[in-house]
Regions:
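ATP-dependent adenylation/nucleotidyltransferase module used to activate substrates
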Residues: 2-171
């Protein structure tokens, strides 16, 4: 009988161990946090990075600039998915019909978008041969829960990296 103790991992079972990471799908906004993450993932995990940017109708975004920036920073692929119609019909319209609001009338549009973004990330990760998905959510809000729970439910084989949470950095 072996006296060797089983290895214990810290964090949730879906969190990536550096030795398990080969190719990462990064949910990429083009902002400072996710741009730093792109390089950090390449350096820390010695991994290839595929970027995914999801257009849910955010105003003022130039998706060609975002894609170009990701490529200049070393992403091996960069995908921009226009999910506005799907988001409007499958999420927003249903929320309006259900009178889904939070607190004093705050619409839940940001929260509603996270499961769709995670679903699209799973699809793209599989299509691009990624074993891990990275996101820029902090450890403070529920966005990380919405994204990670959706990934775990749809693709338990995929691991998750949450650099902002791991770094324990403030903004």
């Amino acid at each position: 009988m072996s006296t060797e103790q089983p290895q214990r991992r810290t964090g949730a079972g879906y969190e990536a161990d550096p030795s398990e990471v080969g190719r990462v799908l990064l949910l990429y906004s083009g902002g400072l946090d996710t741009s730093v993450m792109l390089k950090w993932i390449q350096d820390h995990y010695e991994a290839e990075v595929v970027c995914l940017t999801v257009n849910l109708g955010q105003p003022g975004e130039d998706y060609a600039v975002i894609e170009d920036k990701a490529r200049r920073l070393g992403a091996i692929e960069c995908h921009v998915v226009d999910a506005r119609e799907r988001f409007a019909h499958e999420y927003i319209a249903r929320a309006i019909r259900a009178n889904a609001i939070y607190g004093n009338g705050y619409p839940l549009f940001t929260a509603l978008g996270r499961p769709l973004i995670a679903e699209l990330a799973v699809e793209q990760a599989r299509a691009s041969g990624c074993d891990t998905i990275a996101h820029g959510c902090t450890g403070k809000g529920n966005d990380q829960v919405r994204i990670e729970a959706t990934i775990a439910a749809l693709a338990p084989e995929l691991k998750v990296i949450a650099p902002v949470r791991s770094w324990q950095m403030g903004r």
